[in-house]
Amino acid sequence: IKAKPIVRILEAHDGLCGLIIENLEIKKGLKNASFDGMWSSSLTDSTSKGKPDIEAVDLTTRMQDLNNILECTTKPIIFDGDTGGKIEHFVFTVRTLERNGISAIIIEDKVGLKKNSLFGTDAVQTQDSIEGFCNKIRAGKNALITKDFMIISRIESLIAGKPVSDALERAFAYVEAGADGVMIHSKNKSGEDIKEFCFAFREKHPLVPIVVVPTTYSQIYEEELCSWGVNIVIYANHMLRAAYPAMVKAATSILENERAAEAGEYCMPIKEILELIPGTK
């Protein structure tokens, strides 16, 4: 965070995604562009297992996926912790992630059955009280062995249809409680509410990291996000969203043609897949 104007994070739900993020680098003028780390998304973790995004996949299962990624990559991983669960359980989650080398967890200030934030007010979204969520942050911070692991608070006020002022009140309280950063989330396609939040937050906290997930306001360039005061941008679900349509096309082609030849245009050559992972040949 201190070394770059903005940190670029991409979703990874398995080791192959991790390898792409680890190794992909492109030339842009005089500079090289690459990803700085990975996002372990609860949405893509659960969807890739054929389960709903309601915290149905437990920590033990998610850690197995994370270990697969950790075995073949070196870049930092941010863990999507959903609501964090009960305070008593959250402390064990923090210890497990810290012990296994994960860099940070982001938890959202909601209670009850988790529903994906991008449903907005179309699904029941119940926010925790400020005091209740602050207690969770404090408990997590007290459970840490080192100062390296980050606990980042995700503020759902805008998702719940509340004003920016509510999001700011919560953000200030969470930082006071010990949060190492704040993530502000919104379903608004313009991004204007995010911009308003960032400028207001920066007036009080010029150095506390701000995290955004521009899934709905994807037209905004990283340079502009940086000018708002954003430190970390997470592309939270794009690897799975890219993979699923390609798999459906290949499967549909085989059904339509009763052979695999036509599906070849959607597939990489078999020789390349055999040589993709070092040690296979």
Segments (PLM) and residue ranges:
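Alpha/beta enzyme core
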Residues: I1-I234, A242, T252
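Extended, intrinsically disordered, low-complexity segments
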Residues: L16, H238-K281
